[in-house]
Structures are given as C-alpha cells and as structure tokens.
Amino acid sequence: MSSLHKSRIADFQDVLKEPSIALEKLRELSFSGIPCEGGLRCLCWKILLNYLPLERASWTSILAKQRELYAQFLREMIIQPGIAKANMGVSREDVTFEDHPLNPNPDSRWNTYFKDNEVLLQIDKDVRRLCPDISFFQRATDYPCLLILDPQNEFETLRKRVEQTTLKSQTVARNRSGVTNMSSPHKNSVPSSLNEYEVLPNGCEAHWEVVERILFIYAKLNPGIAYVQGMNEIVGPLYYTFATDPNSEWKEHAEADTFFCFTNLMAEIRDNFIKSLDDSQCGITYKMEKVYSTLKDKDVELYLKLQEQNIKPQFFAFRWLTLLLSQEFLLPDVIRIWDSLFADDNRFDFLLLVCCAMLMLIREQLLEGDFTVNMRLLQDYPITDVCQILQKAKELQDSK
C-alpha cells in the first residue's frame, strides 16, 4: 500500500470519527474515490445516500429502528401472505367467494397474489443474471435471513412461489409503459431452470435471492412504479458493496441497509423509469437531450457529426443514464464511478457530464466512423479507464 493511499485512508478516518460528520469534506474526499479498506466505502455511501445522519450519536438507534422496520416489511409482505396462501382453501367447506381464485374482485386476496406473482417472476428472471462476469450473486450469503428460512416456519416463501406458480411456464415482462406481456414458450423449449435453487442446501440462500427479496418489498411498497427491468442493475452494486463489507456487524445487515439506500437512491432517479414522465423536465428524454446540448457546447464538431449520422441519444444514452452506467463497465469500475456520483452535490447533473466526457474521449473514432461503426462504439464503449473518464467530466464541470 502506497504512502499516498495510507494518507487518504487516514483522511477518511479523521472525518468519519468526528461526532458530527463534515459533509462537504466527506463529499470532497469521496469524489476522488473511496478506499474499500476498513469498510470506508460502505459507511460513506450510507451517509452520502442519506441513510445515516451526520450525527454519529444517533446511528445506533436509527439503524436499530430501520432494521426492525425492514423485518416488519418481511413479516407483512412475505411471511403473512405466505401463511394466508397456505391456508386459503385448505378445506372445501371453508372456501368463501372472497377466497376463491376465480373471484373477479380486483382487491381480492387471490387477485393480489396473482399480480404479485407476475412482478415476482420478472424480478426472479432479472436477478438470476446479475453481474454474470462474477460468481458472487450465485454464492451463498454468510447471513441468510432467518425470518424467512427458519425450518419451523410453514408458509410459502418467495422461493416456493416461483417454483409453484402457475405462471412459471410463461415469460412475464413489465415494460416502462406499465404493460405486462406474457408469452408461453415453444413446446420444445426448456423453461428457465429452477435447479439453481437446488445447488444450495436447506437453510442457505444465494445473494441473488436476497436481492430478489429487496426488489419485491420495494415493488410492494411502491405500487405506482412497482418493479421495472433495470432496477436490478441499480440495487446490485449497492448490495455487493454492503455484503462484502469487511466489518461483520455491518455485513450481517446488508439486506436491510441496501433496501433503504436503494429506496433513497430510487427517490432521486425513479422518474427515469416512468414512461409518462419521459418528456417532462425530470424525465429521461430531457436528460438525454441535455447530454447532446452539453456536447454541442463543448465539442460542436462531434455534435454535428452525430447529428449528421442521425445517431440519437436514445440509441445509447438511455441505458447509460437510466442504469447509472452499471452496464457499461465492470463492477469495480461502476462502484468507482458511483463514488463520484454519490459525492457530487448535483450528482445526476454530474452523470450528464460523465456521459458527455465518454463521447469526447472517443471523438476521433466517432469522427472517422460511419453509422454502424459508431453505434457499435457507443453500445460497447471501448475505454475501460474510468478515472480518465471522471477526470474529463470534472474538467467539463470546472469549465462551466
């Protein structure tokens, strides 16, 4: 470890040990990258995402309160409905019209159950393929949720719901328009394998199952947006960071802490996932156009070239912005970018500058390429040095 790196760690420790955290100083340090040693990144993210307050003295009580609240969410939205499902229609004599699966009432328990299953199946499909370049999400967590996995419990878990649902032979997708599409697979095709569940023994669960639970709870608590594909790519790096915290006391509560940090982050970016807001000033279309207007201001030649080739920002910047660049770089590089995004006062204005910097750093290739070549460049971004990209974005910010 270099003396410079040791000095940076000491600077973070000095800020974080104060009774009242100096937020501006923490932002300044974090913007240049947060060391992963000693759980510094995990702690800084929790502060920068407004999960932990600046007053250290209140941390213990707030964490206890939030973690108990999350446990209550699990009981209300997974355990109790699971018990109700297990009990619904057990005895033919006990079945009421309200309990009947064919009850057309949209507020009936069965109708709610079926709608939840549609959301759950989409989440399940998406979280299974999280970060396929690493094995982390397929491995067992050291801290499985005992509330869910207690062998004494006799209720339908999310795992059982996915295995048993009558919709499992269908592909269910909810797009940003809020439309749910279902299509049965071809007779000869193999449905999505559920054997991944069998890899881990009873009492264990994979990290992706934890992420599935977080997203399901979020969808239940936020019915206006529920779950939209891509949210898994936002929660994944958060959970990975917290679940690999070297401090076991923090790592043990990675699920609850991730949920609340994800919720706070989504409060800032959720408009990107709502199609009806696309053309508003808070919508994704406005932000994509802002990338191009910034490019026009900083590099008019490149801007005109992209315009001439009719390369619209929707073709590439939609994914860049909506998923916070989580699909453009390897996970460690995404985490480094997020250090700067979370640390910046106007973090999602800075994201626009990062996108503009990405364009300018490959300007020569773009100026020389035709439409096909340039689309390939933009959809499979060639530069892997994220520090170079962040430095360029900071230059753009400082030159305003």
Curated annotation (Swiss-Prot):
Presence of the UniProt keyword Cytoplasm in the record: yes
GO cellular component: cytoplasm; cytosol; membrane
UniProt keyword Ribonucleoprotein, yes or no: no
Subcellular location: Membrane; Cytoplasm
InterPro entries given in the database record: Rab-GAP-TBC_dom, Rab-GAP_TBC_sf
Keywords associated with the record: Cytoplasm, GTPase activation, Membrane
Any single GO BP term: intracellular protein transport
Domain of life of the source: Eukaryota
GO function terms (MF aspect): GTPase activator activity; small GTPase binding
Gene3D superfamilies per UniProt: putative rabgap domain of human tbc1 domain family member 14 like domains, Ypt/Rab-GAP domain of gyp1p, domain 3
One Pfam family it belongs to: RabGAP-TBC
Subunit structure: Interacts with RAB1A and RAB10; in a GTP-dependent manner.
Function: Acts as a GTPase-activating protein for RAB35. Together with RAB35 may be involved in regulation of insulin-induced glucose transporter SLC2A4/GLUT4 translocation to the plasma membrane in adipocytes.
Name used for this protein in its record: TBC1 domain family member 13
Organism: Homo sapiens (Human)
Source lineage: Eukaryota, Metazoa, Chordata, Craniata, Vertebrata
